[in-house]
A protein has these predicted regions:
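Charged docking surfaces used in two-component/phosphorelay signaling
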Residues: 67, 157-338
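N-terminal Rossmann-like NAD(P) cofactor-binding subdomain of oxidoreductases
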Residues: 1-190, 226, 259, 290-291, ...
């Protein structure tokens, strides 16, 4: 199988290389593409050195089976036809096509079969905060239909990119040295602070990040449930966390949901309050699953449950989810059979 990665030098592109190798993804030839800045850079994959090629409007994608793209929405829109015109399936990590009615938005644990209907040859990877949430919500939806969702996210600096993570390190150093901190990648100093804004504000007072969770959840889960989100940037490095309040049609017990999490795909139960055992970002970098803890009844709503999630947003929230989509296609799509 011929596989391509567009945006190979970025944080998610590098995660693609690790995940493809970890999971022994079937690759006969791997092609790496990037911008003028990264073209010529060499990376080693399974003992072979591969040079990043300049992404151009040509026939470089002829014969490619699957192309993972993570180079920003503008690049994805600009190069979508170039990538797919010879039959490659484009699995895109940007926001460019997520709400396009002709592009499925897929989290394999929830709606893998949607990936079969792709008139444009494109499958969209959802936003990282949405991915981790719907993996857990699907386990609850399987017990009783979810009517309403409230979520507060606590998102790591790396969600804003490698340069943002470097800025957080530098801010901590500067503050501890008594220097004025550099503020470029965030609206305010993030070190020793939290910022209740991710992306720009929309006319309804919610940010674009918060509205992504509203719209994407409906599309992925095929649900009428509304999702009200509050997205906050916190001074951790990697792994996002979420506090969720979900209302179901019938009351669901704590034990019912715990059992569903134990048996759910892509989920790991970590919930022992007596031992102070619950998911935390510090300990979950590089983990595949969405970790669930602090499960309890919502004391304000007899049909409500409250729980806490942590997941590596660069892994499951980006590269891993895309690779899992590709794995599902290889096993289930006639295009890849034989």
């Amino acid at each position: 199988m011929r596989v391509a990665i567009v945006g190979a030098s970025g944080a998610v592109g590098q995660e693609f290389l690790r995940v493809l190798d970890e999971r022994n993804f079937p690759i006969d030839e791997l092609l790496l593409f990037g911008s003028q800045r990264s073209a010529g850079t060499k990376y080693t994959f399974r003992g072979k050195e591969i040079e990043v090629k300049l992404l151009q409007h040509n026939d470089d994608f002829k014969g490619v089976d699957i192309a993972f793209t993570s180079a920003g929405g503008g690049t994805s829109k600009d190069f979508a036809e170039t990538i797919t015109k010879h039959g490659a399936v484009m699995i895109d990590n940007s926001s460019a096509f997520r709400m396009d009615e002709n592009v499925p938005l897929v989290v394999p644990e929830c709606n893998a079969k949607d990936a079969l209907e792709r008139p444009r040859g494109i499958i969209a990877n959802p936003n990282c905060t949405t991915i981790m949430m719907v993996v857990a919500l699907q386990a609850l939806e399987n017990i009783s239909h979810i009517r309403r969702i409230h979520v507060a996210s606590y998102q790591a600096a790396s969600g804003a990119g490698a340069a943002a993570m470097a800025e957080l390190f530098e801010q901590y150093r500067q503050v501890l040295a008594g220097e004025k901190p550099t503020v470029e990648k965030f609206a305010y100093q993030l070190a020793f602070n939290v910022i209740p804004q991710i992306d720009v504000f929309t006319d309804n007072g919610y940010t674009k990040e918060e509205m992504k969770m509203f719209h994407e959840t409906k599309k992925i889960m095929h649900t009428d449930a509304d999702c009200s989100a509050m997205c906050v940037r916190v001074p951790s490095l990697r792994c996002h966390s979420e506090a969720i309040w979900a209302e179901t049609e019938r009351p669901v017990s704590v034990e019912e949901f715990k059992e569903a999490v134990k048996n759910g795909n892509g989920l790991r139960l970590q919930d022992d309050p007596e031992k102070k055992d619950y998911p935390m970002p510090l300990f979950l970098e590089g983990c595949d699953d969405v970790y669930v803890g602090r499960i309890r009844k919502d004391i304000s709503n007899p049909n409500g449950l409250t729980f806490w999630l942590v997941s590596d947003q660069i892994k499951k929230g980006a590269a891993l989810n895309a690779v899992q989509i590709a794995e599902w296609l290889i096993q289930n799509d006639p295009k890849f059979q034989g």
